[in-house]
Amino acid sequence: MLLGRRLAAMTELLKSVDYEVFGTVQGVCFRMYTEGEAKKRGLVGWVKNTSKGTVTGQVQGPEEKVDAMKSWLSKVGSPSSRIDRADFSNEKTISKLEYSDFSIRY
């Protein structure tokens, strides 16, 4: 049973996607909540504020977890945020993770 799970994990597709979230997403702890949600899901990557009032970043991990995080970024966010839309780009399958954890960039 354990061996089967380990084999499944080894063959699991890894995905990478860049994102930008628009709306009231700065000054509402959006980056902190994004970091917490990504870590809870076992994802790696980064998040940061932009000069144009959006939040941008990259997330990597197993395909279904990345897809769930995309949904969270599009619909949930931090409690005080108001998400107008989330744009996703450069979505691709990767052979290995490029980061060791998820971090807030400044």
From Swiss-Prot:
SUPFAM superfamilies associated with the record: Acylphosphatase/BLUF domain-like (SSF54975)
Protein origin, superkingdom: Eukaryota
Catalytic activity: an acyl phosphate + H2O = a carboxylate + phosphate + H(+)
Phosphoserine modification, residue list: 100
Record-linked PROSITE patterns: ACYLPHOSPHATASE_1, ACYLPHOSPHATASE_2, ACYLPHOSPHATASE_3
MF GO annotations: acylphosphatase activity; identical protein binding
GO CC terms of this entry: mitochondrion
Entry's EC annotation: 3.6.1.7
Domain spans labelled Acylphosphatase-like: 16-106
Keyword annotations: Hydrolase, Phosphoprotein
Keyword Phosphoprotein carried by entry: yes
Positions of transmembrane segments: none
EC class of the enzyme, as a word: hydrolase
Catalytic residues of the enzyme: 31, 49
Keyword Calcium: no
Entries under InterPro entries matching the protein: Acylphosphatase (IPR020456), Acylphosphatase-like_dom (IPR001792), Acylphosphatase-like_dom_sf (IPR036046), Acylphosphatase_CS (IPR017968)
Similarity annotation: Belongs to the acylphosphatase family.
Protein name, UniProt field: Acylphosphatase-2
Species this protein is from: Mus musculus (Mouse)
Gene that produces this protein: Acyp2
